[in-house]
């Protein structure tokens, strides 16, 4: 299957999905739907044993792009976004997110939908919803505490604090820390 905003392949029993909306890889319901469809396809693919989620450009996913035409055309675009986002969490095969640059807002939610997160020193994470006066999306009020604990999650959710790669690793938000973006090849060794 072909995807408009993704680069995909299967190699050595690994399904690769790369978000391809550089440089910031902002998402909308259409992009999240494409990712969810690929993950569902990989669940059915016998040659695939695990999935690596990454992105082209400067950032993993710097949040939502509410200016995209798809939001203007739908009667309730947020409902569709919610429905597509829920699908990300239903994947049966292990998903590893390789995160460079920003994973902000819903981009953090996309990262949290993965089973493992690999960051580099240049990575930064932020649940910036309160700063923007938005409701926390992507289930981050559930997924973030499960990953970093209640106190760190409250701190991130209520202050919109930015957490850099090394600190993300220290608090458990990232499972592995690569030296730099060019060293984010660790997922293939897992």
Report each predicted region and the residues it spans.
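Acidic, divalent-metal-coordinating active-site segment for phosphoryl/phosphodiester hydrolysis
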Residues: 161-167
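PIN/NYN-family metal-dependent endoribonuclease catalytic core
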Residues: 94
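Short acidic-hydrophobic, aromatic-tinged amphipathic segments that line or gate anion-handling sites
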Residues: 176-181
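Conserved CoA-thioester-binding segment of acyl-CoA-metabolizing enzymes
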Residues: 1-56
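CoA-thioester-processing core
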Residues: 84, 88-90, 98, 104-158, ...
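Hydrophobic/aromatic residues within transmembrane alpha-helices
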Residues: 17, 53, 65, 110-111, ...
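Single conserved hydrophobic/aromatic residue that forms the stacking wall/gate
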Residues: 183-190
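Glycine- (often His-adjacent) and acidic-residue-rich active-site loop
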Residues: 7, 33-34, 47, 54-90, ...
């Amino acid at each position: 299957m072909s995807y408009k905003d993704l680069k995909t392949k299967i190699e050595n029993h690994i399904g690769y999905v790369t978000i391809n909306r550089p440089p910031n890889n902002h998402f909308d319901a259409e992009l999240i739907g494409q990712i969810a469809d690929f993950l569902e396809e990989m669940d059915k693919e016998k040659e695939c044993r695990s999935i690596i989620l990454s992105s082209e450009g400067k950032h993993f996913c710097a949040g939502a792009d509410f200016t995209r035409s798809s939001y203007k055309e739908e009667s309730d675009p947020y409902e569709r976004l919610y429905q597509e986002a829920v699908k990300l969490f239903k994947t049966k095969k292990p998903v590893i997110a390789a995160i460079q640059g920003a994973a902000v807002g819903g981009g953090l939610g996309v990262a949290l939908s993965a089973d493992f997160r690999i960051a580099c020193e240049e990575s930064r994470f932020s649940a910036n919803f309160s700063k923007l006066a938005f409701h926390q999306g992507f289930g981050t009020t559930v997924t973030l505490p499960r990953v970093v604990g209640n106190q760190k999650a409250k701190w991130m959710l209520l202050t919109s604090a930015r957490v850099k790669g090394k600190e993300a690793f220290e608090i458990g938000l990232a499972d592995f820390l690569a030296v730099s973006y060019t060293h984010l090849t660790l997922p293939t060794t897992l």
